[in-house]
């Protein structure tokens, strides 16, 4: 099991190899949970657009979580929050969501969660 050290949550390009690998892991996880018609997975190129803020949580050089907001006119929609099983139970998802909330407030928007 992975153990938490200093966690950094930073704005990143989701196409970088370790982050893209985590997004692919999330895709596999979501595909196993929901039927194709219910899965509205946002691809890496979309996540890299200027209207998306994508964050990765890292510790000791390892990517241990991610999350994004997609900017709309008056709100930001939460996308792609994920913490892999090896890093769960340490509160990382809360930290990632708090960072997304902070970014949303900085932009003067409201936060909305999509499914």
Give residue spans per PLM region:
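Hydrophobic alpha-helical core bundles mediating ligand binding, dimerization, or RNAP-core interactions
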Residues: 23-30, 34
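Conserved acetyl-CoA-binding loop-helix of GNAT-fold acetyltransferases
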Residues: 83, 89-102
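Conserved N-terminal entry element of GNAT/NAT acetyltransferase domains
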Residues: 1-17
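Conserved GNAT acetyl-CoA-binding A-motif
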Residues: 97, 104-115
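Conserved beta-strand-loop-alpha-helix junction that forms the acyl-donor binding cleft
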Residues: 85-88, 113-115
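Conserved beta-strand in the GNAT
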Residues: 56, 62-71, 77-82
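A short, aromatic/hydrophobic, helix- or strand-capping loop or linear motif
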Residues: 33-42
């Amino acid at each position: 099991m992975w153990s938490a050290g200093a966690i950094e949550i930073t704005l990143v390009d989701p196409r970088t190899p370790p982050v893209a690998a985590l997004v692919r892991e999330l895709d596999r996880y979501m595909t196993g949970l929901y039927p194709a018609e219910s899965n509205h997975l946002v691809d890496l190129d979309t996540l890299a657009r200027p209207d998306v803020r994508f964050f990765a949580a890292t510790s000791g050089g390892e990517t241990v979580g991610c999350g994004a907001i997609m900017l709309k006119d008056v709100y930001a929609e939460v996308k792609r929050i994920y913490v892999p099983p090896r890093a769960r139970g340490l509160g990382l998802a809360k930290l990632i969501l708090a960072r997304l909330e902070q970014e949303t407030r900085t932009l003067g928007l409201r936060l909305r969660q999509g499914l």
